Amino acid sequence: MQPNEQPGTGPADTTLEQQDTAAAEVGHPRRIRSFVRRAGRTSTGQQRAIDELGPRFLLPYAAAPLDWEAAFGRTGARRIFEIGFGMGETSAHIAQLRPDDDFLGVEVHEPGVGALLKLIGERGIGNVRIVSHDAVEVLAQMIPEGTLDGIHVFFPDPWHKKRHNKRRLIQGPFVARLAAHLRPGGYLHCATDWEEYAHQMLEVLSAEPLLENTADGFAPRPDYRPVTKFEKRGLRLGHGVWDVVFRKRAA
């Protein structure tokens, strides 16, 4: 999800609320979700990219560990997992900047998948693979614990209404899962343009015993994360953006 892009209040959100309510009524815990289904039409160019580049860069979801070396065609690269890459501009930029790292992006929004594939084709990027599925399930089923060198969670849905805060992705139980999947020394980088959510992120990550902050509070924006057009617009309007970067403690 991109900065300043907020979840809607249409049928998809109503369905989520109904599902959560029904689950609570029968005694089931609320399920963590990594996404909000958004409306949007896949453009001709995006669909062409999916058709032409999907066979190489799109990986099927499977309830089995991913063979990274087979998927990326090389060994020894650092493994970076990205949750929700929006329209893919940031992912493409970072992948180009860090050609020695392999990036697995997870996004359910088809126009976003097509947009990133289009950028991959235009820029000749070879170190990105995509799974179009719920990132929570991808992490649980396809990524063994202790195997990731980095995790990116940029501008997740802020769920700005107080009654919806419980739906936010960055909460204690999920951060514990993320930390478990990092190697010792691996990093977790989150960013948001919603100040209250930023403070929650900092608090939740600080409370995770497997993680340590790389900064004294919020981190300076790392050079590899570009300033998006949405972010530039927000900064011109006086809005802030906050980064938190934590590292997994040595075993």
From Swiss-Prot:
Amino acid composition bias (Basic residues), ranges on this chain: 29-40
Keywords from the named record: Methyltransferase, S-adenosyl-L-methionine, Transferase, tRNA processing
SUPFAM superfamilies per record: S-adenosyl-L-methionine-dependent methyltransferases (SSF53335)
Listed InterPro entries: SAM-dependent_MTases_sf (IPR029063), tRNA_(Gua-N-7)_MeTrfase_Trmb (IPR003358), tRNA_methyltr_TrmB_bact (IPR055361)
UniProt EC number: 2.1.1.33
Positions of substrate binding: K161, D193, T228, K229, F230, E231
Chain positions recorded as S-adenosyl-L-methionine binding sites: E82, E107, D134, D157
Recorded GO CC terms: tRNA methyltransferase complex
Gene Ontology MF terms: tRNA (guanine(46)-N7)-methyltransferase activity
Region (Disordered): 1-43
Annotated metabolic or biological route of this protein: tRNA modification; N(7)-methylguanine-tRNA biosynthesis
Region (Interaction with RNA): 163-168
Active site location: D157
Catalysed reaction equations from the record: guanosine(46) in tRNA + S-adenosyl-L-methionine = N(7)-methylguanosine(46) in tRNA + S-adenosyl-L-homocysteine
Matches recorded under PANTHER family: 3-DEOXY-D-MANNO-OCTULOSONIC-ACID TRANSFERASE/TRNA GUANINE-N 7 - -METHYLTRANSFERASE, PENTACOTRIPEPTIDE-REPEAT REGION OF PRORP DOMAIN-CONTAINING PROTEIN
Family: Belongs to the class I-like SAM-binding methyltransferase superfamily. TrmB family.
Role: Catalyzes the formation of N(7)-methylguanine at position 46 (m7G46) in tRNA.
Protein known as: tRNA (guanine-N(7)-)-methyltransferase
